Design a protein with these regions (language model features):
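Helix N-cap/capping motif at the beta->alpha junctions
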Residues: 26-35, 56
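Alpha4 helix (beta4-alpha4-beta5 surface) of REC/receiver domains from two-component response regulators
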Residues: 58, 74-75, 86-103, 111, ...
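Two-component/phosphorelay signaling modules centered on CheY-like receiver
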Residues: 6-25
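Hydrophobic/aromatic residues positioned on beta-strands within the core alpha/beta folds
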Residues: 82-83
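Active-site residues of response regulator receiver
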Residues: 48
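A Lys-centered signature of the CheY-like receiver
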Residues: 106
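Receiver (REC) domain active-site loop signature in two-component systems and cognate sites
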Residues: 51
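Short amphipathic alpha-helix used as the core "switch/output" element in two-component signaling
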Residues: 35, 57-74
Length: 129
């Protein structure tokens, strides 16, 4: 699941679907991303570090708390954060948190995000293969 700015959502979704053999859900709002994460099982979460009302790290934390308290307990998938302020101390500190698998700085080449995704999700293949 990808949650970020609407224009970037469209570009990222199209690139992921075209490049990888995977299903991609997108969300224009963190509240909707939260609802999706409760309804479906995901192999990976990709959230913007800075979103309205709640940041990507807090959204990830909240999803994890809910997953720990539902029966049967669900394992939270790894998170890749996208950030326009990747050099900030808080963004760098988040990389040390359990489950945070990477940080991609904006602006970014889609290939950089694809590489991070492949490293996080075993079995994701290039569609060209």
């Amino acid at each position: 699941m990808v949650d970020d700015d609407v224009a970037l959502l469209r570009v990222v979704r199209e690139a992921l679907v075209a490049s990888l053999q995977c299903e991609v859900d997108t969300s224009p709002k963190p509240e909707y991303a939260f609802e999706l994460a409760l309804k479906k099982k995901y192999d990976l979460l990709v959230f913007d570090f800075q979103m309205p009302m709640i940041d990507g790290a807090m959204l990830f934390f909240l999803i994890g708390k809910v997953y720990q308290n539902i029966q049967p307990m669900r394992e939270i998938p790894p998170l890749i954060l996208i950030s326009g302020k990747a050099e900030e101390t808080r963004a760098q500190e988040l990389l040390k948190e359990p489950g945070v698998a990477g940080l991609v700085a904006k602006p970014f080449a889609i290939n950089r995000l694809l590489e991070k995704i492949k490293a996080c999700v075993p079995g994701v293949e290039d569609a060209a293969r």
